[in-house]
Amino acid sequence: MVEDSQETTHFGFQTVAKEQKADMVAHVFHSVASKYDVMNDLMSFGIHRLWKRFTIDCSGVRRGQTVLDLAGGTGDLTAKFSRMVGETGKVILADINDSMLKMGREKLRNIGVIGNVEYVQANAEALPFPDNTFDCITISFGLRNVTEKEKALRSMFRVLKPGGRLLVLEFSKPIIEPLSKAYDAYSFHILPRIGSMVANDADSYRYLAESIRMHPDQDTLKAMMQDAGFESVDYYNLTAGVVALHRGYKF
């Protein structure tokens, strides 16, 4: 039970004290880190690769630029950005969770992604970088786990260079009603079973489904980005809104 005097937030469908959420999310990702890539393929039927490819294509990243892959996990986007920025550029893979960061580092080194990638354990709400550092920031399937999303968006805005852009790839709200119902059935009944069988962790994947439902919808997130200072904010619905890619600029 959370005392009324405490500031609260949501952890899935639970109401928890704000200071508790980060530890609870950390526990989830410590638990799932070793099976993260396998579960991504199973949960999305491999479609997450297309969503990430679209994000890369919309990034405008060029040779010599500096990119922050925030909540970068096992490094899918970092691997692509590393090739795009080349030897004269740099990619920082940042994640608040050390288990996920370790998995990302091992995976990328095993496939030969070295030299222009750095690894930083960082909280999105208080990024440890100077103002105006990055040409591009991406956060892929990570924003919904952040306790204070508005604070994180302001932090991202601060470390972007003028002319830089933020891309937020995140689960969103399906725009077709029959799909929405089928998606709910899959998320709440099938997904935890897959998590139990493959990762021996139904609870973490039940949290995943709940956290998606609690995440702001497309237009709400667009407004939040605008409030944080981003301009020319737009979004693309992917797979009929199951996922949305938001993009905003710092001018």
Swiss-Prot record:
The signal sequence is none
Q: What is its EC number?
A: 2.1.1.163, 2.1.1.201
- Pathway the protein takes part in: Quinol/quinone metabolism; menaquinone biosynthesis; menaquinol from 1,4-dihydroxy-2-naphthoate: step 2/2; Cofactor biosynthesis; ubiquinone biosynthesis
Q: Where does S-adenosyl-L-methionine bind?
A: 74, 95, 123-124, 140
One Pfam family recorded for the sequence: Ubie_methyltran
Q: Single GO molecular-function term?
A: 2-methoxy-6-polyprenyl-1,4-benzoquinol methyltransferase activity
Catalytic activity field: a 2-demethylmenaquinol + S-adenosyl-L-methionine = a menaquinol + S-adenosyl-L-homocysteine + H(+); a 2-methoxy-6-(all-trans-polyprenyl)benzene-1,4-diol + S-adenosyl-L-methionine = a 5-methoxy-2-methyl-3-(all-trans-polyprenyl)benzene-1,4-diol + S-adenosyl-L-homocysteine + H(+)
**Matching PROSITE patterns:** SAM_MT_UBIE, UBIE_1, UBIE_2
**Enzyme's top EC category:** transferase
Q: Could you tell me the superkingdom of the organism this chain comes from? A: Bacteria
Keywords, alphabetical: Menaquinone biosynthesis, Methyltransferase, S-adenosyl-L-methionine, Transferase, Ubiquinone biosynthesis
Q: Name one GO biological process term.
A: methylation
SUPFAM superfamilies, per database record: S-adenosyl-L-methionine-dependent methyltransferases
Q: What HAMAP family is this protein classified in?
A: MenG_UbiE_methyltr (MF_01813)
The family annotation for this protein states: Belongs to the class I-like SAM-binding methyltransferase superfamily. MenG/UbiE family.
Q: What is known about what this protein does?
A: Methyltransferase required for the conversion of demethylmenaquinol (DMKH2) to menaquinol (MKH2) and the conversion of 2-polyprenyl-6-methoxy-1,4-benzoquinol (DDMQH2) to 2-polyprenyl-3-methyl-6-methoxy-1,4-benzoquinol (DMQH2).
- Tell me the protein's name: Ubiquinone/menaquinone biosynthesis C-methyltransferase UbiE
Organism from which the protein derives: Salmonella typhimurium (strain LT2 / SGSC1412 / ATCC 700720)
Source species taxonomy: Bacteria, Pseudomonadati, Pseudomonadota, Gammaproteobacteria, Enterobacterales
Q: Which gene encodes it?
A: ubiE
